[in-house]
């Protein structure tokens, strides 16, 4: 069997490191062609020594010399740096699939280039579909490229749809742990810190997505993702707070039946399923013990306390470049909150005000989306500055 060549965009992050564990378990099937990181040169070099890729890319050009020095005794591994290198490496002929696991807007252009180069896309970077869902889906159809979801929720929906047509979907059931502040009052939310928000009750993730989970913006992004991945309207996507995080999401069909995917919280499962689809491979890890589950609970989300979820619905219903503005403002306020420059409730207020001020474009091109991203970031930064 010819080994599939994988490029991992964001190999030092939470998804990237777990993807490498999947590769460790299936070295007979998969081989790493390229690893990339933002600025973690030590871990990237360590990964490169273990997996011996043809190339590594560090996005932060100031870290190039450090990475080069760490891999000085590995001359067969080519070392590159910068955004242009990231956008180019995904087009390399030997690559069969690209795991898009970079965080934020930075993952958009490499993913577009990978689609144009007809690489199978395993999508963990949700901002790509949030910002440019129509563009990405049109490109994927044009180039006959499959996009396999890596988010646990979208993988669960995808698995629930095996054997059924998208047209048979009545409703998507998108589950959500509720985050660490599910029981907090508005008054309590005013005083929570980034350290509080980073204590997610179920998943171990990167800092940015953990904050997004605390505000429920992450779930809002997943609503937008689901619209594009499964061809449904936002009104057909129902968010359910499910604190146990055992039901990862599901589908209600036109005949009233429901299919869902259950399992222990382990991101390696959706990563591996995206790699191996349509096959299902063995995976070492914990198994779900239903006898140990005393209850499975489901609640409606409170959009008054967590307005970011409502803002995401508003953005996708308005359409055009509004989801792009939503994402740009969110990246700004998320970083500000992590650096103690913004209170928890001010994140949603800033995002809402940014969306109101951003120039609307009903049919944005890629260039227009890049302009929207820059405009919305500037507006959000200005609003945060005015709050001081």
Q: What residue ranges belong to the model's regions?
A:
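Catalytic, metal-anchored helix/loop core of enzyme active sites in primary metabolism
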Residues: 1-388
